[in-house]
């Protein structure tokens, strides 16, 4: 990528204005270069990451584009890329090789697969000088490698310019070492999430998978999935009003999509009913996170509007003028069509809610106050007045429709008469709409979860002890087992080997059924375990055991019978299971 003519603002006034820092940033990092192009959104993304958490002086994309035109007055625009993934590019500029952001730019070019004739690969390394020196040798290499499953490591990117800035303040070697260690730590977490999903589902035996595919079992595990996904949500984005970076929100969305992809790949080959059940829950999980990240992004922008007293004052006065001047008369008929009698527009719950929200403008900069006001109106006019799920759905749909009509009428009036505050209103409008959808949708999802829990409880038997394992009667002996087996009275009576390819195994004890559930490996000790389900058909009780290979476990039944389970570790996929019955008391 050849560097060209250095950039300079076309006007001296611009460099001394309120955006002088942005202009100087453009001059320091970009230059004029024919036959080169820079993606517009990528250029702005690097600028946003440079600002970090200091968003007070950060400019929006439209202002940033105007400043780019100010610094590069003869700049062209091109739309490059394949159909469906084309991006607008600034044509005629390039990033300087001396820029702190050069390595990061090259990496992002490869990661996002932007079209650029001079794009080079960026190796994930903290040696930034070697990155530039290896430019020629990296041209024919892919910037990242992904496996068919979609490894999360390809989406985990470094921030070399920030690392370089920290290296200038502190020890360079220590900073490079610490950055490498921490990034490896983050990658290990992502890798382990995928490995946990894959290892669990791929280790299940066929009869276990068939058991999990039964409708009532699917319903039971659905309750566990709900808890799992809610726990992940609390960790990733507990409150969407938290002030988090845009990059973090992108990472949350990316993780949820990757999680769904990993699960689908792990479920390949399992019965369709089980796949559908798991797909439904993980899809709801992705949608909830998408709603939260979208709300968080809008809340971040709206928070900047509320901090500007001038913009809030103009917005409030314009909204009051629209309502007081009767500009919303066109929506009266639509809003009052569902009312019995001659209810006035001003007495509608939607108008009351809007008036209360307008009155809060200028009195508080806390976004929670506005959203709490909307929530209280929903609680009063929808939640408290509904006595059934069907009635709630009807009231919620009616309120949402009328609310949308009202806000759309306000937007129309803003467009025609109050252009100065239209941008602020548009943000406020979108936030209110999306927040209402989030509340109503979350309520419906919680209602469905409660119904699922009720279905699971209905499937439980009337006798609370029925089907519950008696841990006192079913126990395994570890240290004392060798001593007990050494006793002369504990000679085994018989051995019955069986092949583990079947789902049910005769065990040499009447009315006893042994099922193989799967295999586990103790990574800490290196021991291999086998999970079995032992069922007593007479007492209708069962217990799940994790038995070590090559050792014995003593089982005592309710009727006093005792037998030892011994599992021998044999090659390939077969196991010899020996059951030795002993009626002696131990």
UniProtKB/Swiss-Prot annotation:
Residue spans binding DNA: 22-97
GO CC entries: chromatin; nucleus
Biological process (GO), any one: regulation of transcription by RNA polymerase II
Location in or out of the cell: Nucleus
UniProt KW Protein biosynthesis keyword: no
GO MF term set: DNA-binding transcription factor activity, RNA polymerase II-specific; RNA polymerase II cis-regulatory region sequence-specific DNA binding
Source species, domain of life: Eukaryota
Alphabetized InterPro entries for the sequence: DNA-bd_RFX, RFX-like, WH-like_DNA-bd_sf, WH_DNA-bd_sf
Keywords: DNA-binding, Nucleus, Transcription, Transcription regulation
Function statement: May be a transcription factor.
Family that this chain belongs to: Belongs to the RFX family.
The name this protein goes by in its record: DNA-binding protein RFX8
Native source organism of the sequence: Homo sapiens
Gene (UniProt): RFX8
């Amino acid at each position: 990528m050849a560097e060209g003519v250095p950039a300079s603002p076309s006007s001296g006034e611009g460099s001394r204005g309120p955006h002088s820092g942005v202009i100087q940033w453009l001059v320091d990092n970009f230059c004029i270069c024919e036959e080169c192009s820079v993606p517009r959104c990528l250029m702005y993304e690097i600028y946003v990451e440079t600002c970090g958490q200091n968003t007070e002086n950060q400019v929006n994309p439209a202002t940033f584009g105007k400043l780019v035109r100010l610094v590069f007055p003869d700049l062209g625009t091109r739309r490059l890329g394949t159909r469906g993934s084309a991006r607008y590019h600034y044509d005629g500029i390039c990033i300087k090789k001396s820029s702190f952001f050069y390595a990061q730019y090259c990496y992002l070019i490869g990661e996002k697969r932007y079209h650029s004739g001079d794009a080079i690969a960026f190796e994930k390394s903290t040696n930034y000088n070697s990155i530039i020196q290896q430019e020629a040798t990296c041209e024919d290499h892919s910037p990242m490698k992904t496996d068919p499953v979609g490894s999360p490591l390809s989406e985990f990117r470094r921030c070399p310019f920030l690392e370089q800035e920290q290296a200038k303040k502190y020890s360079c070697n220590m900073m490079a070492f610490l950055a490498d260690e921490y990034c490896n730590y983050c990658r290990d977490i992502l890798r382990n999430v995928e490995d946990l999903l894959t290892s669990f589902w791929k280790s299940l035996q066929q009869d276990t998978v068939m058991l999990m595919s039964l409708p009532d079992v699917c319903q039971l595990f659905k309750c566990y999935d709900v808890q799992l996904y809610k726990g992940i949500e609390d960790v990733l984005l507990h409150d969407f009003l938290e002030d988090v970076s845009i990059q973090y929100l992108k990472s949350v969305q990316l993780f949820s999509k990757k999680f769904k992809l990993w699960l689908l790949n792990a479920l390949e080959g399992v019965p369709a009913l089980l796949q559908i059940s798991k797909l439904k829950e993980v899809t709801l999980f992705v949608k909830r996170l998408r709603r939260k990240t979208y709300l968080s992004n809008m809340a971040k922008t709206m928070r900047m509007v509320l901090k500007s007293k001038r913009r809030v004052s103009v917005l409030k006065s314009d909204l009051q003028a629209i309502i007081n001047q009767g500009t919303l008369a066109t929506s009266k008929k639509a809003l009052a069509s569902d009312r019995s009698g001659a209810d006035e527009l001003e007495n509608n719950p939607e108008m009351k809610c809007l008036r209360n929200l307008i009155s809060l403008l200028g009195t508080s900069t806390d976004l929670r106050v506005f959203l709490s006001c909307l929530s209280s109106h929903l609680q009063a006019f929808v939640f408290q007045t509904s006595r059934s799920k069907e009635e709630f759905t009807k009231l919620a749909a009616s309120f949402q429709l009328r609310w949308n009509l009202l806000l759309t009428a306000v937007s129309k009036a803003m467009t025609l008469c109050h252009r100065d505050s239209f941008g602020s209103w548009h943000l406020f409008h979108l936030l209110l709409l999306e927040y209402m959808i989030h509340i109503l949708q979350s309520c419906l999802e919680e209602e469905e979860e409660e119904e699922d829990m009720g279905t699971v409880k209905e499937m439980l038997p009337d006798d609370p002890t029925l089907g519950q394992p008696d841990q006192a009667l079913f126990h395994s002996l570890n240290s004392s087992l060798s001593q007990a087996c050494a006793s002369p009275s504990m000679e085994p009576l018989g051995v019955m080997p069986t092949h583990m390819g079947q789902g049910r195994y005769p065990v040499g004890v009447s009315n006893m059924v042994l099922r193989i559930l799967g295999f586990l490996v103790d990574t800490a000790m290196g021991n291999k375990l086998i999970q079995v389900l032992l069922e007593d058909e007479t007492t209708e009780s069962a217990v799940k055991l994790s038995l070590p290979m090559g050792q014995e476990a003593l089982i005592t039944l309710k009727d006093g019978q005792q037998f030892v389970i011994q599992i021998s570790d044999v090659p390939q996929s077969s196991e010899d299971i020996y059951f030795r019955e002993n009626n002696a008391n131990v």
